[in-house]
Amino acid sequence: MKKLVLLFALVLLAFQVQADSIQNTDEETKTEEQQGEEDQAVSVSFGDPQGSGLQDAALGWGRRCPRCPPCPRCSWCPRCPTCPRCNCNPK
């Protein structure tokens, strides 16, 4: 029984030493990040509220946009400036 208690105490001591070394490493990392940290602006955009041409194209092949007239050269593509599939649009 004494051996079991001694073994358990050694295991707990080993875990505590390991936890202390991990905590010290985390503190060193935070200190390094703060020293090298600069004011940086980050901009994240998930698209405009109206959607994009790729999203519109993904919704349906050959689907005409109700706000755009059909192309005079080909009847299957809309004449939208945002349509990525229309080869007739001047770019």
Curated annotation (Swiss-Prot):
Cellular localization per UniProt: Secreted
A GO CC annotation given for this chain: extracellular space
Sequence repeat spans: 65-67, 68-70, 71-73, 77-79, 80-82, 83-85
Propiece span(s): 20-65
Primary localization class, coarse: secreted
Signal sequence coordinates: 1-19
Region of interest called Disordered, as start-end residue ranges on this chain: 22-55
Molecular function in Gene Ontology: identical protein binding
A family per Pfam: Defensin_propep
Annotated GO biological process: defense response to bacterium
Entry keywords, A to Z: Antimicrobial, Defensin, Repeat, Secreted, Signal
Region: 6 X 3 AA tandem repeats of C-P-X, residue numbers: 65-85
Keyword Secreted annotated: yes
Sequence similarity: Belongs to the alpha-defensin family.
UniProt function note: Apparent precursor of a secreted, cationic, proline- and cysteine-rich peptide that contains Cys-Pro-Xaa repeats. Unlike cryptdin, the proposed mature peptide region lacks the structural motif characteristic of defensins. It may have microbicidal activities.
Protein name: Alpha-defensin 31
Gene: Defa31
